[in-house]
Amino acid sequence: KREKFIITLIDGQLVIAGSDRRGTIYGIYELSQQMGVSPWYDWADVPVEHHDSIFVNKGIYTDGEPAVRYRGIFLNDEAPCLTSWVKNTYGTEYGDHRFYQRVFELILRLRGNMMWPAMWSWAFYADDAENEKTADEMGVVMSTSHHEPMARNHQEYARNRKGWGPWN
């Protein structure tokens, strides 16, 4: 089974176990959501509920394996709104690993596992070497759309048009 988790008590200890790394992540975020943390807490300013204590019922909780293998979002038409927000928030002209870490967390909290990165003026792999590493460490599969064959986008080509040899 893939991306499956269980939450249970064993000898009075809370155990969250996943069939794989994303399964474990989903189990942790499920418990977080049951404690009142919205998947959107960071993006939509959803307040996190305060609890003086939490309790876990005996038994095993699981949602089972996802019915759809790849689930995610495509950051489309990001300019000017998202690109301006990133510049004002992080001081960069591109989505760096700090920005994508927040996006990846949202995707995982929503039980997604995939993302198609922004492409107008950004180049996911070329802009910040930490982007790819962050996606891998967080368990998010990167994909590309019609505009980015072989995971390379127009910006990478435009920036290096003269530097890739006579076959351009």
Where on the chain are the PLM-derived regions?
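Contiguous, structured surface segment used for ligand recognition
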Residues: 1-65
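Aromatic-lined carbohydrate-binding surfaces of glycoside hydrolases
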Residues: 47, 67-168
